A protein has these predicted regions:
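FIC/Doc superfamily catalytic core
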Residues: 1-235
Length: 235
């Protein structure tokens, strides 16, 4: 992965703000266009907009703001408190299973046989993936891999994917990488994610897709000289 530095990554996140929120919101059923989403995020809600879409966007913005304020304060890390606070912000309207903490009931995932980590094992599971993340030497890549673990294990009653996406964006930026987001209602990504849930051997397939998305975002912000270096590193 191509590192661009913290300040530049923050600039890119700021420029992509509406797009990042839009992609994540599409995964949750937002019916607005990108333009309507941008207008709503700026405080001008279009006519005939569904209330639940407005609430969804407001919650995602709150989650985004929380993370990026912590980054600017040099105080953003992957830990349970930050993770749970983020879910409380982004899922305040639809997570009724111990909001602000790990879920207390088992869940089902539409289209998948996988049901997430069993409730008695959530704390142990989080400890294990935290150690895995901090021990992982694959700089940058480990952040995207962590995203997959957070999605698959389903630590919350609702809002797992949106929480994980914003955490991923924040960790990427804090480490000096360009952020990116995915609409998991897209058939290609929806299928890849479900396949990964049901078969751990499919992890590399979706990981490569996600890394390619991040690469394309990075390339779109590089100048000619940087692109040349970027392509040389790829070779």
């Amino acid at each position: 992965m191509y590192k661009i530095g913290l300040n530049r990554a923050l600039m890119i996140a700021n420029k992509m703000f509406e797009k990042l929120i839009y992609d994540i919101s599409l995964s949750e059923g937002n019916s607005m266009t990108l333009l309507e989403t941008a207008s709503t995020l700026s405080g001008k809600v279009p006519k005939n907009t569904r209330v639940k879409d407005v609430v969804l966007l407001a919650n995602l913005k709150n989650g985004y703001d929380y993370i990026f304020e912590k980054i600017k304060e040099n105080n953003f890390y992957f830990d349970k408190e930050t993770f749970c606070t983020e879910n409380r912000l982004v899922a305040s309207n639809d997570n009724f299973d111990n909001l602000g903490g790990f879920r207390q009931h088992n869940i089902r995932i539409v289209g998948a046989k996988h049901t997430g980590v069993a409730v008695p094992n959530l704390e142990k599971s989080f400890f294990e993936i935290s150690n895995k993340y901090y021990d992982d030497k694959r700089v940058g890549i480990k952040i995207v891999d962590l995203f997959l673990d957070l999605c698959k294990n389903k630590y919350f009653g609702k809002g797992n994917t949106r929480t994980a996406q914003l955490m991923m964006c924040g960790l990427l930026v804090s480490e000096g990488y360009a952020p990116f987001s995915i609409n998991f209602k897209d058939a290609e990504y929806s299928e890849a994610l479900i396949n990964f849930y049901d078969d751990e051997n499919k992890r590399d397939i979706i990981l490569k897709k996600l890394l390619n998305e991040q690469k394309e975002v990075t390339k779109s912000f590089l100048n000619k000289d940087e692109l040349k270096i970027f392509k040389e590193k790829e070779i």
